[in-house]
Amino acid sequence: MKIMMILEMLFLIGMVILVVDISPYFGALGLIVVSLVGCLIILAKGNSFLSLSLLLIYLGGMMVVFSYCTALVLDLYPTVIVKEVLMKMALGVLVVVFLGYGGYLKADNGVLSMLGEGGVDNSFLGAGVLYGESWLLIVFGCLGLFLALLVILEITKSAERGAYRVI
């Protein structure tokens, strides 16, 4: 129960990092935190295969989007816009976590009782659907992400000319 509370707080922190700042560097950090913690939450619920496949898809897609956003950014020295909001939120999260560890917050309703009984279900329930009839769609999706990454890397390679970078 305490693990899920910590994961949900980390998910909330990642969402605030994503929303508060306009710099793509911190936005990519927020997306990575949100995707990792979201996949850990799915893993804690018992779906290990779905968690792994979503993690690979999220990180592959985010690599392309982050490369494109940093190619177009004009920010040489990114700063956090709202430092006070992040500090107050971190203090609030620490208070909630310590209250939860002290036993003052009771939220056990039996939904997460599987965490105490043995952890993760290792069944491959989603493998048949992902690799059955839709294998060609997965291959084309991976090739599309790879092609987009190559295009973005070609755009960022020409940093000395064009309107993409300010030097």
UniProtKB/Swiss-Prot annotation:
One of its GO terms (molecular function) is NADH dehydrogenase (ubiquinone) activity. The keyword Cell cycle does not apply. GO terms for cellular component: mitochondrial membrane. Its EC number is 7.1.1.2. The keyword Nucleus does not apply. Pfam families: Oxidored_q3. Keywords: Electron transport, Membrane, Mitochondrion, NAD, Respiratory chain, Translocase, Transmembrane, Transmembrane helix, Transport, Ubiquinone. It catalyses: a ubiquinone + NADH + 5 H(+)(in) = a ubiquinol + NAD(+) + 4 H(+)(out). It is a multi-pass membrane protein. Its main location: mitochondrion. The chain crosses the membrane at residues 24-44, 54-74, 85-105, 135-155. It is an enzyme of class 7 (translocase). It is found in: Mitochondrion membrane. Core subunit of the mitochondrial membrane respiratory chain NADH dehydrogenase (Complex I) that is believed to belong to the minimal assembly required for catalysis. Complex I functions in the transfer of electrons from NADH to the respiratory chain. The immediate electron acceptor for the enzyme is believed to be ubiquinone. Belongs to the complex I subunit 6 family. PANTHER family: NADH UBIQUINONE OXIDOREDUCTASE SUBUNIT ND6, NADH-UBIQUINONE OXIDOREDUCTASE CHAIN 6. This is NADH-ubiquinone oxidoreductase chain 6. It comes from Myxine glutinosa.
